[in-house]
Regions:
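Short acidic-aromatic low-complexity motifs
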Residues: 1-19
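Exposed alpha-helical structural elements
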Residues: 3, 15, 40, 108-111, ...
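A general structural-boundary detector
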Residues: 3, 28-31, 75
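Hydrophobic pocket/interface hotspot
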Residues: 4, 16-17, 24, 37, ...
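Short N-terminal micro-motifs specific to bacterial/archaeal maturation
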Residues: 7, 31-32, 87
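A solvent-exposed, acidic/Ser-Thr-rich amphipathic alpha-helical stretch
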Residues: 13-15, 19-66
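A beta-strand edge to alpha-helix "cap/lid" segment located at domain peripheries
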Residues: 46-128
Length: 128
């Protein structure tokens, strides 16, 4: 999981996406249905990277050789502070197969949801 953490912290999104399984499942903190497949998850990761300011991981939980990890983070959306956790499961071949995000407090989660809606609205309206 260290490779993923380092890729995110350095802003190397190409390296982070390269660690995703083709059939990755991403569970958003604000959308009920999961996103499935690298083609759906990659644009979300890139949008989140544009929206979250001062993003930093503060804690990593899990056996480095194990399949399941939790990466605790802090960030900001505008004037809203938030903290959250990325729960990550590595599947066969060590690729990230499941990615589940939780965020608190509600005010931070709502600010993130609105900022993400604005980021993704143009591509949704054009069908891209």
């Amino acid at each position: 999981m260290q490779q993923f953490r380092e890729a995110i912290e350095s802003g190397d999104l190409d390296a982070a996406v390269a660690l995703f399984a083709d059939d990755i499942v991403f569970r958003s903190p604000v959308v009920h249905a999961p996103y499935q497949g690298r083609a759906q998850v990659e644009p979300l990761l890139r949008a989140v990277a544009r929206v979250l300011e001062d993003f930093r991981y503060t804690c990593q939980i899990g056996d480095p050789e194990g399949a399941d990890h939790a990466l605790v983070f802090r960030a900001r959306v505008g004037d809203r502070e938030l903290e959250g956790c990325d729960f990550i499961h590595r599947g066969e071949g060590g690729r990230i197969a499941e990615f589940y995000v939780m965020i608190r407090p509600l005010s931070g989660q709502l600010a993130l949801a609105e900022a993400m809606r604005q980021q993704l609205a143009p591509s949704e309206s054009t069908g891209a």
